[in-house]
Each structure stands twice: as C-alpha cells, then as structure tokens.
Amino acid sequence: MERVAKLSTEKAVVIFTASNCPMCHTVVSLFSDLGVGAAVHELDRDPLHGRDMERDLARRLGRSPPVPAVFIAGKLVGSTDRVMSLHLAGKLVPMLKAAGAIWL
C-alpha cells in the first residue's frame, strides 16, 4: 500500500503500533532508550487508513496482528522478535547509526 510505503520513509525509524499492544510499547521504549526519535503510528487511532495499513503490514510480515512493525531507513526490519534478536546480537545499534537515527 502506498500509505505504508510513504510513512515508512518519513524518519530514520518508523514504528507501526496499536495502542493496546504491550509488545508495541516494549519496542517503542527500546528505541526511545537508545535515543532514537522514532515516528510512531498507532493504527487503531487512524480511522481513515488504519485498517488498510494493518492489512498491508500483515501481508508484508506474513502474520496477523502485524504490530509492532519496525522500519529502519525505509526498510522493513520486522516485529518484536526480529528487533530484539538484532539488539541482543549487537546489530541494531550499527543499523541505527547507518540510518542516521543515532550518532553515538
């Protein structure tokens, strides 16, 4: 969907979430703790486009619910499991630096 593609490039890190999703909160908190000013889009709070974006993300991720869905430098990284795996392997911070999301 065009809207997800457009929004996913608005900042170095973009996270699609739902307001009632505990794992979404965890992922957003992780990026915040790392000093990333991510763009966060809560799909359930967008009455005009939320459902369409949710379907598009479910198709891209191959699962439902599709949140959280994390994009770094406009590329879909994945959901909680993928983000946490990258972080534990020491690969997330270099990705964020390369994307210009953090400078330290």
Curated annotation (Swiss-Prot):
Organism from which the protein derives: Oryza sativa subsp. japonica (Rice)
SUPFAM superfamilies: Thioredoxin-like (SSF52833)
Keywords: Cytoplasm, Disulfide bond, Electron transport, Redox-active center, Transport
Protein name (database record): Glutaredoxin-C15
InterPro entries to which the protein is assigned, alphabetical: GlrX-like_pln_2 (IPR011905), Glutaredoxin (IPR002109), Glutaredoxin_subgr (IPR014025), Thioredoxin-like_sf (IPR036249)
Name of the gene: GRXC15
Purpose: Has a glutathione-disulfide oxidoreductase activity in the presence of NADPH and glutathione reductase. Reduces low molecular weight disulfides and proteins.
Predominant subcellular localization, coarse grouping: cytoplasm
Record's subcellular location: Cytoplasm
Residue ranges of domain Glutaredoxin in the record: 1-103
Disulfide bonds: 21-24
Homology family: Belongs to the glutaredoxin family. CC-type subfamily.
Superkingdom of origin organism: Eukaryota
Record CDD domains: GRX_GRXh_1_2_like
GO cellular component, one term: cytoplasm
